[in-house]
Design a protein with these regions (language model features):
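Domain-level signal for soluble alpha/beta catalytic cores
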Residues: 1-180
Length: 180
């Protein structure tokens, strides 16, 4: 999830191709290129799809190191703008991120793209990729309390990632039902 690895575009493509082929051949309507820490990897996957499966719709979601930077150090605006040339990408966003990063990142993305915006952050628990452990800090707002802010900031596809559960997903569903 840190993006601190280097492969060639061809190596990224060889790694992802078997799963992509299985999913596309099974008839998926949209392919999730999710939890991506590295722009070069995303672009390699998109080039592969453009050549082999040009009709396949996808969405891309990045992991973040802060509200303006994806995990490999690429500025978020650059990572979002890089997707604009790919007509197959119908939505962009972030996932597996801390709650406090979501709203500022959404506002940033909304200024760059007209594509649908996706967020599915972790609950308030925080993951440390070095120790591979979760901790529960005291936060100023809960997942449930922040959903309206994310919607207001432009998110139209909202879900949950690590340590979210039925309570958080119900809160998203209830909010969407009230605000259609």
């Amino acid at each position: 999830y840190r993006g601190d690895y280097e492969l060639s575009a061809e190596e990224y493509q060889q790694f992802h191709l078997p799963r992509i082929e299985e999913l596309v051949n099974a008839g998926v309507d949209i392919l999730a290129i999710e939890t991506q820490p590295k722009l070069d990897e995303v672009l390699a996957i998109l080039e592969l799809l453009k050549k082999k499966y040009p009709q396949q719709k996808v969405y891309v979601s990045y992991t973040l190191s802060d509200d303006d930077t994806i995990s490999d150090g690429t500025p978020l605006p650059r990572a979002i703008h890089a997707l604009e040339d790919y007509s197959q990408v119908i939505a962009v966003g972030i996932n597996c991120v801390k709650l406090e990063l979501v709203e500022p990142a959404l506002k940033n993305m909304k200024e760059i793209t007209d594509k649908h915006l996706i967020v599915y952050p972790n609950s308030s628990a925080v993951y440390d990729p070095k120790s591979k452990t979760w901790s529960q800090p005291k936060t100023s707002a809960t997942f449930e309390e922040l959903i309206p802010n994310w919607y207001e900031a432009g998110a139209r596809i909202i879900g949950g990632c690590c340590t979210t559960g039925p309570k958080e997903i119900k809160a998203v569903a209830d909010f969407i039902k009230r605000n259609r």
